[in-house]
């Protein structure tokens, strides 16, 4: 027998590199010829500069004759490795006039390139081939399309780029393992599946592609798993009461798989899909596609002229935005496209926008007592970049000690959105429109408000929920295609004028009202000749358009520009139905089940404490506690509702041997007490949460007062 058993050769060193490592992925197969007392690594033998394959495949070692191997070892013994300074350097750089020699493992250590093709050339670290890109428009990090870990999209020895797909980046180690497993017949670009161009470039950059069948082709029942489809809902919040594994064909609870990888799924209802025919991608695949530039800015849709719609109807109910009328031939095609485009989950859309956030962090110093001014100063700082990750530190104004303490980003964004909703930049009770504030316009505050709102949405802030449908339609479809309603008018006197005009029953009554309001109508340019009673409808329409839209045109344009930060406005215009749910409507009320599902247990659970926790949530929901669901969430996270993009990190529960609960808003962690009785548990929870939130409000009022 010529070859040793695998166990016998483990301690034998390669005659070229003098290492006894047995690592096929790194050094190639380790082979020992017992008869000739010879052990070699395949790559060390293959890349040696002074040896050629003169025999047949079954002769010697891989076709290299034993006598040739001994001659090469003898030649290399006279050459010193420029890395480890030891003799036996059998590999030399092929660059002209370069005299560097090294062992194969030493070359790997110094990031040399070994080309496993042609003449099997090797290049030292100074002369190795490199990948060149003409421009780098990539964000700070992109995922390796094999392992999906984020990497810096800059070509280097360890980071390679696909020659056929601009958005495909790889770790060298991931590519090498992939090549060894796939072999020459199945090694190809992970995005476009190109093999010729891809393999040629990878060989140039030193990836070894063995001439063998794929490893999975050699396994028994290799394709058995392909006979089973992935049937599980993997979205963050599954809505199916039957569970994530429930699959009911031809219903809203049918499982739809990712069209890219097929290894993630969703119920149609959980991702707001109307039918099984609609395309759906999982978050991992969508992140890769998003960064490739596949998501193009959607064109703004125009509302049809509503000349045939009665003005009275506009006063009583909200206008319903519709797409332009199309020819019958294109209508069905576009409806299919719109079904896929507009029926998207808003949390998924915000997570997509969140891919822009870089690893670099910007610390914001925020005074909770003056949240607006400190936020304005932070966002206007020339070093602030909306795409940087936000870190919050709370400070106290006029504090001689200059103390600061870590703050919760989501709490800060929640406080900022609350201030924005109640600020003088908006008017209205619940559904708000932009106001006309000349000083705010002069200070560019409308732009800053739009910018803050965009940043809040992308960085995990709460749902604003206070936009009127009119303001929303102006942003999506344009002011020229939006008809305001009476509820949009917050000025009592103007609203009374509109009501009096609209309720006039005769031409004489109508003219009488117009005469009383003559100066106002002349000032806003809405005077018109009245000949019939129906003229009142056009007059009401003109007044509404002026007061709600034209009067605030300058603030609107400024606010709109701010919303373009991080591409938020473009996303709103592309998916209006999804964003309407968070811009025009308050989030759903919290329940015991929602909070129970929201918090995960990270530490070793205490069964009794967790039972008390679930009972406490139910008691709060039933009104048997002095706290509310919102109080609990604020105590633990700083937010009164679940942000559309979700919490980062995910809220967690810890069972600690303490008497009172502890809320860590920076980590979204709630430590619940371990008590002997449920009564003691509830009393301690109520007391701590109620008094903590009360104290925070009093401190805020105290600072404002000073």
UniProtKB/Swiss-Prot annotation:
A zinc finger (PHD-type) spans 79-128, 143-193, 237-286. It is found in: Nucleus, Nucleolus; Cytoplasm. SMART domains: HECTc, PHD. This is G2/M phase-specific E3 ubiquitin-protein ligase. It catalyses: S-ubiquitinyl-[E2 ubiquitin-conjugating enzyme]-L-cysteine + [acceptor protein]-L-lysine = [E2 ubiquitin-conjugating enzyme]-L-cysteine + N(6)-ubiquitinyl-[acceptor protein]-L-lysine. GO terms for molecular function: ubiquitin-protein transferase activity; zinc ion binding. Keywords: Apoptosis, Cytoplasm, Developmental protein, Metal-binding, Nucleus, Repeat, Transferase, Ubl conjugation pathway, Zinc, Zinc-finger. A zinc finger (C2HC pre-PHD-type) spans 11-51. Its EC number is 2.3.2.26. Disulfide bonds: none annotated. GO terms for biological process: apoptotic process; protein ubiquitination.
């Amino acid at each position: 027998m010529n070859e040793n058993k695998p166990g016998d050769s483990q301690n034998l060193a390669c005659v070229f590199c003098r290492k006894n490592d047995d690592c096929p992925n790194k050094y190639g197969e380790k082979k020992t010829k017992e008869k000739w007392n010879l052990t070699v690594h395949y790559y060390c033998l293959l890349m040696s500069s002074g040896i050629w394959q003169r025999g047949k495949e079954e002769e010697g070692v891989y076709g290299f004759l034993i006598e040739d191997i001994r001659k090469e070892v003898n030649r290399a013994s006279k050459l010193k490795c420029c890395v480890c300074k030891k003799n036996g350097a059998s590999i030399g750089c092929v660059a002209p006039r370069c005299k560097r020699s090294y062992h194969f493992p030493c070359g790997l250590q110094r990031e040399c390139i070994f080309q496993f093709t042609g003449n099997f050339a090797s290049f030292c670290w100074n002369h190795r081939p490199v990948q060149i890109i003409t421009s780098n428009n990539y964000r700070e990090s992109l995922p390796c399309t094999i392992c999906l870990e984020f990497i810096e999209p800059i070509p280097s020895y360890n980071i390679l780029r696909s020659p056929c797909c601009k958005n495909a980046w790889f770790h060298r180690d991931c590519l090498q393992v992939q090549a060894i497993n796939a072999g020459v017949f199945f090694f190809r670009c992970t995005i476009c599946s190109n093999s010729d161009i891809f393999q040629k470039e990878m060989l140039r950059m030193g990836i070894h592609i063995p001439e063998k069948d794929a490893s999975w082709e050699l396994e028994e029942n290799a394709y058995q798993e392909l006979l089973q489809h992935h049937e599980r809902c993997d979205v963050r919040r599954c809505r199916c009461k039957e569970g994530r594994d429930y699959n009911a064909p031809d219903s809203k609870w049918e499982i739809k798989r990712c069209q890219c990888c097929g290894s993630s799924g969703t119920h149609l209802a959980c991702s707001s899909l109307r039918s099984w025919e609609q395309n759906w991608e999982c978050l991992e695949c969508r992140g890769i596609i998003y960064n490739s530039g596949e998501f193009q800015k959607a064109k703004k849709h125009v509302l049809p002229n509503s000349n045939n719609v009665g003005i009275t109807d506009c006063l009583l109910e909200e206008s319903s935005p519709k797409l332009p009328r199309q020819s019958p031939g294109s209508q069905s095609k576009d409806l299919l496209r719109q079904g896929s485009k507009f029926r998207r989950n808003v949390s998924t859309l915000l997570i997509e926008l969140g891919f822009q956030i870089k690893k670099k962090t910007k610390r914001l110093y925020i005074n909770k007592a003056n949240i607006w001014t400190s936020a304005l100063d932070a966002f206007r700082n020339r070093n602030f970049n909306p795409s940087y990750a936000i870190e919050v530190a709370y400070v106290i104004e006029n504090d001689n000690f200059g103390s600061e303490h870590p703050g919760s980003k989501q709490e800060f964004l929640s406080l900022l959105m609350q201030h924005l909703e109640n600020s003088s930049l908006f008017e209205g009770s619940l559904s708000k429109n932009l106001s006309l504030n000349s000083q705010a316009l002069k200070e560019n505050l409308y732009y800053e408000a739009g910018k803050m709102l965009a940043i809040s949405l992308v960085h995990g802030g709460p749902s604003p929920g206070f936009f009127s449908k009119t303001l929303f339609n102006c942003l999506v479809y344009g002011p020229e295609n939006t008809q305001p309603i009476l509820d949009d008018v917050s000025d009592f006197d103007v609203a009374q004028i509109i009501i009096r005009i609209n309720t006039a029953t005769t031409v004489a009554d109508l003219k009488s009202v117009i005469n009383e309001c003559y100066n106002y109508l002349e000032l806003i340019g809405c005077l018109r000749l009245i000949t019939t009673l129906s003229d009142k409808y056009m007059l009401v329409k003109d007044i509404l358009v002026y007061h709600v839209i034209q009067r605030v045109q300058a603030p609107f344009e400024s606010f709109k520009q701010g919303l373009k930060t991080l591409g938020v406005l473009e996303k709103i215009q592309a998916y209006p139905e999804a964003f309407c749910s968070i811009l025009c409507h308050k989030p759903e009320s919290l329940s015991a089940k929602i909070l129970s599902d929201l918090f995960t247990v990270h530490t070793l659970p205490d069964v009794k404490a967790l039972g008390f926790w679930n009972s406490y949530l139910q008691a709060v929901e039933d009104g048997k506690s002095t706290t509310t669901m919102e109080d609990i969430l604020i105590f633990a996270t700083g937010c009164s509702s679940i942000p559309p993009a979700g919490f980062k990190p995910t809220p967690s529960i810890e069972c600690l041997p303490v008497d009172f609960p502890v809320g860590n808003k920076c980590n979204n962690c709630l430590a619940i007490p371990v008590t002997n009785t449920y009564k003691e548990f509830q009393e301690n929870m109520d007391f701590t949460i109620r008094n903590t939130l009360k104290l925070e409000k009093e401190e805020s009022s105290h600072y404002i007062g000073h």
